[in-house]
Amino acid sequence: MRKSKTKISLNSIPGGELFDRVIEDEFVLTEKACICFMKQILEGVSFMHTKNILHLDLKPENILCLTKSGNRIKIIDFGLARVHEPHKKLQVLFGTPEFVAPEVVNFEPISFATDMWAVGVITYVL
């Protein structure tokens, strides 16, 4: 019988939070950069959803830039994430208020659309 092992992998990501990047005085957020960020965010969320994972705390503070000057990003902080099982009703009452979907506020069943609400807010913020 094999023992299961838990492994933790830590990466250094020196670019900082996407939120901090876009509010820097010297950073000019162009339409092209915004499209680049959103494309990666959508690809990341799509990948999570194919694995039936709901992030439930998507916000610019949970998106890190890989470098100080580049546009590559990583989605972080899966502390509130849940496995989505379509046949089971899942309700939550947590998240960052500015980014939570109406179904969270109303304590109604959540789904992939809950994360997509936050993606829409991120798009608006950018």
Where are the regions a protein language model picked out?
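Conserved short submotifs of the Hanks-type protein kinase catalytic core
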Residues: K3-E17, R21
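Activation segment signature within eukaryotic-like protein kinase domains
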Residues: F37-M38
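Catalytic-loop of the protein kinase fold
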Residues: H49-L66
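Conserved activation segment of eukaryotic-like protein kinases, specifically the C-terminal portion
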Residues: Q91-E103
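Activation segment
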Residues: F107-F112
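Conserved catalytic-loop aspartate of Hanks-type protein kinases
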Residues: D115
